[in-house]
């Protein structure tokens, strides 16, 4: 019997790498994306490209409009995306986003009878988001194994965060070795409709630094007006 895994896929660099890792580990991969009315909607088209390139069994996108709550520069157009690193948790944090996404992945995993969920959170080269830490992942896994029919009946769920302790350079190096085409991905928080990056947001900065540190060419497509810092 094949082993199934649900992979959370944003369409960015990290989640594409996680998809490649899951495939390399022999999983039949079912990708789940969330259309939460994010500012950088080009990442949803990127997710489609990545799933096709890396051979996912299925890709589903769930629509859940988090802009009705706002509270983040990624869901509220009145909040500007910062161009320089800030102190504390940045305004690009989307309240409870990873918890929502993992909950949806958990529901689908139960239906698929899959015991494994992959997420691309990273605790080193990240922006300070509280739901990108190892203790958060462990806590969600503990909750999942208390709250699901499958776990109660003996089919426990494992939450895999293979990038959690990796630098961005480590991530792009491993992904490249696994055949990830990063030109298909979109990381920018304010990418234009064609998926071209701004070059100045925190996500662009971390992505670019990763390729430089890894000694790899940066395949990111930048908008004509992009500022590279």
Swiss-Prot record:
Record has Zinc as a keyword: yes
MF term (GO), any: zinc ion binding
Keywords per UniProt: ATP-binding, Ligase, Metal-binding, Nucleotide-binding, Queuosine biosynthesis, Zinc
Annotated positions binding ATP: 9-19
Cofactor(s) required for function per UniProt: Zn(2+)
InterPro entries linked: QueC, Rossmann-like_a/b/a_fold
PANTHER family per the UniProt record, alphabetical: 7-CYANO-7-DEAZAGUANINE SYNTHASE
Name under which the protein is recorded: 7-cyano-7-deazaguanine synthase
Native organism: Methylobacillus flagellatus (strain ATCC 51484 / DSM 6875 / VKM B-1610 / KT)
